From Swiss-Prot:
The gene is exc. This is Exclusion-determining protein. Conjugative plasmids generally prevent the effective entry of donor DNA from other cells carrying identical (or closely related) plasmids by encoding a barrier in the cell envelope. In R144 this type of exclusion affects only DNA transfer. It comes from Escherichia coli. The lineage of its organism: Bacteria, Pseudomonadati, Pseudomonadota, Gammaproteobacteria, Enterobacterales. InterPro entries: Exclusion-determining_protein. Keywords: Plasmid.
């Protein structure tokens, strides 16, 4: 019997279907189930309601369940991702080669992504957990990114990695324009690095996997 192959896809084939379904739940499902839940609850609590139909109670409690359960499930998953990311980031901070200043790091709960900038050491760290149950842990210095592109929603870091030429940083992690300007100012200034921080992060992939309990993608 063949062992089950562990996926390395950041976004598996089912993700598009789940993404569309989630959008439909937020924009259509929540208003509909909220209307049904409140309407039937008011009906059951009304003095004018003399019925005792099982269907009315099924619809009422079913509406409340479908309104609340998906949100609770998604929030629980997001919190789990956040804790895994925090553990990895904290371990890297303890190395002494990455210590971001206050206001120069952020974590997006909804997208499971972290980004921080260490002005003193000239290093940056990107950590993200993808729907395919795989994690990116990528260290940057002023030598392994080529340019940045910004808009209101994200910062795009164009890298020198062949298999990951661009890294998207959500705006919840860092203000795109501010982070971009800071990175280019750091590159113009120049740094003397005691260690190759990006390589150090890659060489410790197995350690990050043990901490997070999931595979960490290799970048090259």
């Amino acid at each position: 019997m063949k062992a089950k192959k562990e996926t390395t896809d950041r976004f598996p084939t089912w993700w598009l279907f789940y993404y569309v379904l989630r959008k439909a739940y937020f924009f259509l499902g929540i208003p509909f189930f909220l209307f049904c839940a409140l309407g039937f609850t008011e009906m059951l609590c009304s003095d004018r309601y003399f019925g005792n139909k099982v269907e009315d109670y099924v619809v009422t409690f079913g509406s409340w369940f479908l309104l609340l359960a998906p949100g609770i499930w998604m929030y629980s998953r997001a919190k789990t991702r956040r804790e895994k990311i925090r553990k990895v980031v904290q371990t890297i901070k303890e190395s002494g080669f990455y210590s971001p200043e206050k206001g120069y790091e952020g974590l997006s709960l909804t997208q499971g992504a972290y980004f921080g900038i260490d002005l003193k050491n000239g290093t940056m760290l990107y950590v993200r957990i993808y729907p395919g149950n795989i994690m990116d842990v990528i260290g940057f210095d002023i030598h392994n990114f080529t340019r940045t592109v910004t808009d209101d929603k994200k910062l795009e870091i164009h890298t020198k990695y062949i298999n990951l030429p661009m890294v998207p940083v959500p705006s919840w992690c860092a203000h795109p324009e501010t982070a971009s300007n800071t990175m280019h100012a750091m590159a113009s200034r120049g740094y003397d690095y005691p260690v190759d921080f990006p390589r150090l992060i890659q060489e410790k992939r197995k350690e990050w996997e043990q901490i997070a309990g999931m595979p960490v993608a290799e970048v090259f």
